């Protein structure tokens, strides 16, 4: 065979293979489009399957175009039973760092929300950080004027604990300028307060769906805890205030089951003032340490039973824990009455440990700077000044802010008690710093069986930002 014949033969074979390959593809496409859809599904190219994994159950919506699958993951309920939460608090010798979001540092160059009032709450499988956004991002023109508490742009959103409040991982929860949230073991319940000052409305969401509402009953800035509500055996409790911030107001405790309000109680507290309660479950009851924005530099204490009966008074300890406050040496303490004559205040917390109490407070007596937590012997039941432990979380050279409580459920820890935890907000920007905005980050600590060294886990952002220099 001469060279020309070889070339012709090789070319003919190659062309034949190409034609055969094309014919096979045509047959494959014809079978896929015309034959397979007719096999019991009326020509539909879409299908839904359920696949069970060890860690959870996911519904996968599978859309098929010939050889391509597009899969959307749809979340299922985390559990089929309510959390008990009737255990006692674990004894804590100190508090170890759980998370720190560094949101403002990241937000100088990242897409991070302007926020205030962050708090933490836990389900049987995870803890989430909730926060009230201002409908704007750090280092953006819309951050101007965000020192304002209430606006139509504020929303409650959440991320997994430790994540910054960024636009890519945040989950919308409610329209709100005041809020609370908690998990009953099956689904998240969130309560977002929004609307005009005189006719604000609290919208209850359960599993992401609006299920009930509470209208303002006193017409004066209906508001709630700015920290976790408390669920016990499927029933969730929270506290609301309606009325003046600097004199007698009205207070109510609410109970809901699966997002529907099933009870409420008026809290009679003449001469006392309750706002922004920090609550946690303990031995089958809800224990709250709140803010007196009227006169007291000691904190109100509210203990709620499952039937909504309650005991209300003040934290007995002979050390004040609100800000501003006077000298420790000049404070005597009271279990029943407000002490001191310092108006205003800041959200705070405390934990009962038998008759003792862990109480958090700013280190500064006059401003929201620094943060420490003290353990006072018999401070829950007596006017004791006996400080038996102290731990510094933020030093007094750095700004702090609100603080609040939550617990780790036994489903998370596998212990037979509820781990006490707290968070500290670190406010940056206005009114203390020369910026056009106000925002915050947070540090979260949880109780452990060991003493923890003092340190300062402060915010650390370098201000001003570029937007502040324009």
From Swiss-Prot:
It is an enzyme of class 3 (hydrolase). Inhibited by the neuraminidase inhibitors zanamivir (Relenza) and oseltamivir (Tamiflu). These drugs interfere with the release of progeny virus from infected cells and are effective against all influenza strains. Resistance to neuraminidase inhibitors is quite rare. GO terms for cellular component: host cell plasma membrane; membrane; virion membrane. The chain crosses the membrane at residues 15-35. The keyword Transmembrane applies. One of its GO terms (biological process) is viral budding from plasma membrane. The keyword Calcium applies. Glycans are attached at residues 42, 46, 54, 84, 144, 293, 398. N-glycosylated. Ca(2+) binds at residues 292, 296, 322. InterPro entries: Glyco_hydro_34, Sialidase_sf. It is a single-pass type II membrane protein. Coiled coil: none annotated. The influenza A genome consist of 8 RNA segments. Genetic variation of hemagglutinin and/or neuraminidase genes results in the emergence of new influenza strains. The mechanism of variation can be the result of point mutations or the result of genetic reassortment between segments of two different strains. Belongs to the glycosyl hydrolase 34 family. Homotetramer. This is Neuraminidase.
